[in-house]
Amino acid sequence: MAKASIQFFRGVDEPVVPDIRLTRSRDGLTGQATFRFEQPAAIAPETMGDITGMWMVDEEGEMVTREINGKFVNGTASALEAVYSWKSVQDFERFMRFAQRYAEANGLGYSQNQNSDQTDGDANAEA
């Protein structure tokens, strides 16, 4: 079984784990996942080559997005942001299977905002 990984260069796993944010349409058919990588290995000075996409690879195969943007601070690359979009429930379910495998492979958790009216704050804070 192949370990779930993200690659900016085919065959080279990106070691930096991104922050991932999901948005979906009200009908649930379309949506996108935004990946933000802070100081990824793919933009290290010693890395050669152009980044032409982000591949999400697991035991089912691969998904790819070409929507990649670099973030720069004082003229130096500091982050990468990639957006993966889906246009069907099947595509979303496939993405979520990858996300679950990727989370397990990297010791990550998953949290979901159940109520858009929630306010930020610590629910366990003492008065």
From Swiss-Prot:
HAMAP family: PSII_Psb28
Assembly mode: Part of the photosystem II complex.
Membrane-topology annotation of the record: Peripheral membrane protein
Biased composition (Polar residues): 109-118
GO biological process terms, semicolon-separated: photosynthesis
GO cellular component: photosystem II oxygen evolving complex; plasma membrane-derived thylakoid membrane
Chief location bin: membrane
Similarity comment: family membership: Belongs to the Psb28 family.
Matches recorded under InterPro entries: Psb28_c1_sf (IPR038676), PSII_Psb28_class-1 (IPR005610)
Protein name: Photosystem II reaction center Psb28 protein
Biological classification of the source: Bacteria, Bacillati, Cyanobacteriota, Cyanophyceae, Synechococcales
Organism: Parasynechococcus marenigrum (strain WH8102)
Residue span of region Disordered: 107-127
Any Pfam family hit: Psb28
Compartment(s): Cellular thylakoid membrane
Assigned keywords, A-Z: Membrane, Photosynthesis, Photosystem II, Thylakoid
